[in-house]
Amino acid sequence: MPAVIASNPNAYALERARKAGIPTYVVARKSYPSSKAMTVALVEQLQALHIDLVVLAGFMVILTSEMVQAFPNAILNVHPALIPSFAGPGCYGLHVHEKALEYGVKLSGATVHFVSEECDGGPIVSQKAVEVLPDDTPEILQRRIMENCEWKLLPQAVSLFCQGRLKVEGRTVRILD
């Protein structure tokens, strides 16, 4: 892993990376006059590091088209719902789980997908579901999905990408043997 870049200077991932001797960088949205300016800085940083794959985890910024175009089918995101449900602008963090509970779904989960110019609309790599229990709160459901889905799916998807086993065909991602 060549670097960990965070939008939040207090992200625990930065501390973990430092302890592992991995270079860290913070690209905070508020440090730039616009999303586009932040994206330009981020793309320049990633290209300078010769990055092949960008992995988003808890990155609460919708990427601009410039970023997506700079890394086509090379940005993975984990979303805390079964896309296409509870996805798109405004569906992040606890909001996703609040909406799932309000809707009365029986299953929720996580999706790892390639990032496209449509928010949460890229080709799906993998999904995993958990049961929604009668006494769930948004916080309890969020924790169950993180531990049982997100934390398992994302490393698996990264591994498959690094092994050259993901093939994007339109909206479909095939996992090669």
Language-model regions, residue ranges each:
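One-carbon transfer enzymes
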Residues: M1-D177
